[in-house]
């Protein structure tokens, strides 16, 4: 099979936000060639548009594979309708113009047998040009910023303890549906997730877990491994009677969530990764050891997490973090027992595998803070792009949380929760 890429670039006098408000409506009828269009969802909740073109009876179907409101990019793949196309993947990016207005870049990568490839590419070029022209010439809606939707009423929560080895403590809601389980970072606790827990509980059952050794959970008798964390997730799933899970992680919690997804992809209805994903699984042995030793030095000197919490907060917090946010981050860090912090650190710096993203069969949402020093937008965007490339049928969303540092759900809880709820609402029950 031969491959070819078609690309069309244009400009619009409208702002990038105004153009994106049109383009991001994946099932909107803004393209002049479209006669009819409607939205469908596949079994995983992925968005599919089914449409016909003027003068044709063929029904075309395309699945949204990538969406980023913060980057103003989307990608899609052809499912049916184009005769002879082995594969067909499109991408649209809206950027700021050099002298105001917007730049519009639309491309499609086509794979087909050589005799048919040229005809598909010629037809594609005409379609892309017509779409770019429509976006360039049409007077788009006002550039006024769209008002965010209000968050739903908070769901009631309760604390429970799962007895066993080790004891696990969590806060949960009593809603129905898959279980949305929140996993905190190395310097956090389940309390970091309370705003998201209450919001998610209005969509499905939700729970925030204290990882072993944190908060109300007990530390195991021997050094923890990522397998132990995955077993703890299975215990929570069984205790709460959940058929499927949506894992939501932050930093260390993101690495644990991805590790679980590698082992049990069939159990996950969705995967949400914030401020991390690969952990130290792609770092060299020297890099991992340097990281571990540098963070063990204060512990070996007899300090506790409470002693070095102020220095940690300076790294975690964004430049505009409020005093209240900094105080919350400090309290979370200061409450961690030294043995727990050491245990988590050793586990985190001894990953057992490098992730195979082709195993991620579920919808994935990735987020990070604009000012995250530990998991920068460029890094997390890059990982999301690799998942897009390697997953067999990707359904990926990536967002940068404005004006947030590493613990983006704590610094910008409303912005984080809105994106999370958009993701949860699309998942099948």
List each model region and its residues.
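Conserved HGGG/HGGXW glycine-rich cap/lid loop of the alpha/beta-hydrolase fold
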Residues: 166-222
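A conserved amphipathic terminal alpha-helix motif
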Residues: 103, 108-150
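Conserved alpha/beta-hydrolase catalytic His-Asp/Glu region
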Residues: 282-289, 301-358
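Hydrophobic-ligand binding "helix-grip"
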Residues: 31-32, 38-41, 54-101, 109-111, ...
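Flexible "cap/lid" loop of the alpha/beta hydrolase fold
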Residues: 116, 258, 262-263, 268-301
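Hydrophobic ligand-binding cavity/cleft-lining segments
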Residues: 1-43
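Conserved acidic catalytic loop of the alpha/beta-hydrolase fold
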Residues: 228-244
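Conserved loop-alpha-helix segment in the C-terminal half of the alpha/beta-hydrolase fold
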Residues: 361-404, 415
